Amino acid sequence: MSCSEVFSRYAGASSIHSLSRLMIRRLALRAVAATALTLSAQLAHAGKTLDGVKQRGVLQCGVGTGVAGFSAPDNKGRWSGLDVDVCRAIAAAVLGDPEKIRFVPLNAQQRFAALQSGQIDVLSRNTSWTLTRDASLGFHFAAITYYDGQGFLVAKKYKVTSAKQLKGAQVCVQAGTTTEKNLSDFSRTHNLGIKPVVFDTFEAAFKALFSGRCQAYTTDASGLASVRNKEAPNPEDYLILPELISKEPLGPVVRRGDDEWFAIVKWTVFALQEAEELGLTQASVDQARSSTDPSVQRFLGVSEDTGKLLGLDKAWAYRAVKAVGNYGEVFERNVGAKSLLKLPRGLNKQWNQGGLVYAPPIR
């Protein structure tokens, strides 16, 4: 091989190497630019919800259309329930007043569109946390406020004592819910040939059971207790079957892209749960501000300012508990022993009492 041939080959290899390095540099610059654009978009959106709530002076909270124990208005139009109290706690933490709130009743078909469009700031409406909803709708599930499962309500006159006896039965169910899909899966798994009778609203579905249109009605077990005790013509004529056919972790939902607001909603729920573990109640929280317990001092903002990490002031957690009480109080008042539903705590007990409620440390 001549010197000229060697040089030619070397020059060609060198050119290819230089070109490769140039392409790598260009790709790297594009990646950096894309990352910068993403970060700038996130930063531009960060805090948008909190700013809007503060400017408006009102929290817009999406709730159910009338589920006793969770979200329902009384005859004077005042809302109450576990989901409602979560929103009141958020309003207290953010705006300093649990009454600075507008409740927006939404059915299952309306709820996600209302959140996506910005009609509401937070959705607190017995909504199950699933992979599909979490990954594809552009939402964050902030926390779990109630561990539930799907069950069945039947009229005792049908002599049904197990869900597996519902072969060929007409079962009332609400459209656009995980309940509808779970019913189909349960029917196929056990070869029951269940005939779903689908309704657009919660109310229409359970009323069809009472009118005799269906042999059973299915929804979350907590909802069944609500319907049986509050809506049935005679509660003693109806039975909640023992089987739960799904896991239904319920909790508040926010839009993706606003990490600050996501953190505020999440940590407000954790504050209610942590308050119960610390023994802080709605009645005792004022006196507790003079406590020498470091955990209590930190929680109430006496010794540390955790609120600045959330864009709030140091008394945010104090106000949330003062407004609605701790998680145990919220539970018992709305769905537990002090309510019409009389539901047991079950999985909704604190972690150190055999339940699943476990708040990360507020510190």
Which functions belong to the PLM regions below?
Residues Q60-G69, W79-V94, S128, D148-A204:
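Bilobed "Venus flytrap"/periplasmic-binding protein-like clamshell domains
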Residues A46-S124, L310, A315, A323, ...:
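Extracytoplasmic small-molecule ligand-binding "clamshell" domains
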Residues D85-R88, A92-V94, K157-V160, K164, ...:
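Extended ligand-binding regions for polar small-molecule ligands
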Residues S40-A41:
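N-terminal signal peptide c-region/cleavage motif recognized by signal peptidases
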Residues F7-V32:
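Bacterial N-terminal signal peptides that target proteins for export
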Residues R88, A92, G96, K100-Q165, ...:
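Acidic, polar ligand-binding/catalytic clefts
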